[in-house]
């Protein structure tokens, strides 16, 4: 009897609801970050979030008797990823402090498009097809609408948006590198060691560049930090990877378009951020691009087949 391929499984209704729930959790993370910024410094927020997440993942690994120690030759790989991870998060948090949550959510969800482009050159078998190329065009058309938004120009958001774009590009590089090495060890080890590596650097950044580490500690700030640390960075990681192992990437990635919708909607509802016509158009184009990229017809030809030896 042939072995069942999880990537080919259809999700039952309960799994569909659970996946949608996870996508909403991830999509609303930028809102939680912005709320935390109202009481904590930029790098202080990152340091607290990932130190808490590292502790939670470490305890989860111990309770579930996962192997924490790295094998020979893995340390260098994890350190390379950890450096990219730290740069990525530093840029993202800095950029988000100069923009708003809904714009950050939209820009963060350009990640699949950057990954597709890099994977075309560096991951054997991952080629940009005509369909994917069209999806990329849709996604970046959405970015054009974002930068044409008059209210964003008046508010001075473009600097933050550009920093977030740089963060997403570094994030894509880290993801493509991770795809090349991930088969050699459990995913949780990468997350655990990268967060442990980044925390001292985030605290150093907080001491050097945050005007104040803590300037207002109230219930919304505490809840926002717990949400980032325990819900998205800890529970979200375990839950998503559990679903990924059970049902496969194809099934789960069909729902990622929900993330930017959640980010924009909650940014407007909870933070009172303006949802302008151009933001709505940007959302439509980016969500459409994600949907096109993750739609899987049976056969498709590569748009620009090239040699990709490294």
Regions inferred by a protein language model and the residue ranges of each:
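C-terminal transmembrane-helix exit sites in multi-pass transporters
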Residues: 59-65, 111-134, 261-280
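Hydrophobic transmembrane alpha-helices of multi-pass small-molecule transport proteins
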Residues: 57, 79, 117-118, 131-149, ...
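Membrane-interface helix-cap regions at the ends of transmembrane helices
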Residues: 28, 35, 39, 53-71, ...
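Specific transmembrane alpha-helical segments of multi-pass solute transporters/efflux pumps
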Residues: 25, 29-30, 58-108, 145, ...
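Glycine-/small-residue-enriched transmembrane alpha-helix faces in small-molecule transporters
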Residues: 2-44, 83, 87, 91, ...
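Helix-helix packing/entry segments at the starts of transmembrane helices
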Residues: 46-48, 104-110, 177-200, 229-269
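Juxtamembrane helix-entry segments on the extracytoplasmic side of multipass membrane proteins
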Residues: 11-15, 39-43, 47, 70-75, ...
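Transmembrane alpha-helical segments that form core, pore/gating elements
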Residues: 57, 115-117, 121-122, 153-210, ...
């Amino acid at each position: 009897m042939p072995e069942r391929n999880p990537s080919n499984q259809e999700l039952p209704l309960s799994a569909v609801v659970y996946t949608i729930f996870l996508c909403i959790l991830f999509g609303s993370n930028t809102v939680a970050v912005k709320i935390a910024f109202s009481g904590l410094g930029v790098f202080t927020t990152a340091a607290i979030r990932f130190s808490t997440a590292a502790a939670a993942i470490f305890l989860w690994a111990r309770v579930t008797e996962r192997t924490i120690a790295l094998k020979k030759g893995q340390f260098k790989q994890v350190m390379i990823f950890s450096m990219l991870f730290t740069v990525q998060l530093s840029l993202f948090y800095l950029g988000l402090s100069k923009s708003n949550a809904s714009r950050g959510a939209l820009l963060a969800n350009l990640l699949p498009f950057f990954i597709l482009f890099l994977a075309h050159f560096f991951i054997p078998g991952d080629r940009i097809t005509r369909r994917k190329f069209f999806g990329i065009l849709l996604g970046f058309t959405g970015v054009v609408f974002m930068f044409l938004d008059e209210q964003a120009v008046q508010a001075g958001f473009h600097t933050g948006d550009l920093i977030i774009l740089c963060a997403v590009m570094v994030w894509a590089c880290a993801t493509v590198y991770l795809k090349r090495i991930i088969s050699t060890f459990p995913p949780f080890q990468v997350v655990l060691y990268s967060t442990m590596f980044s925390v001292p650097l985030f605290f150093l950044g907080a001491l050097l560049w945050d005007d104040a580490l803590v300037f207002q500690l109230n219930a919304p700030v505490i809840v926002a930090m717990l949400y980032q640390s325990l819900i998205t960075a800890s529970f979200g990681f375990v839950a998503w990877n559990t679903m990924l192992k059970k049902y496969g990437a194809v099934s789960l990635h069909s729902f990622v378009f929900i993330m930017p919708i959640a980010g924009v909607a909650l940014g407007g509802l909870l933070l009172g951020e303006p949802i302008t016509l151009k933001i709505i158009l940007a959302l439509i184009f980016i969500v459409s691009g994600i949907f096109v990229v993750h739609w899987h017809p049976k056969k498709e030809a590569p748009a620009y087949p090239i040699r990709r030896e490294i």
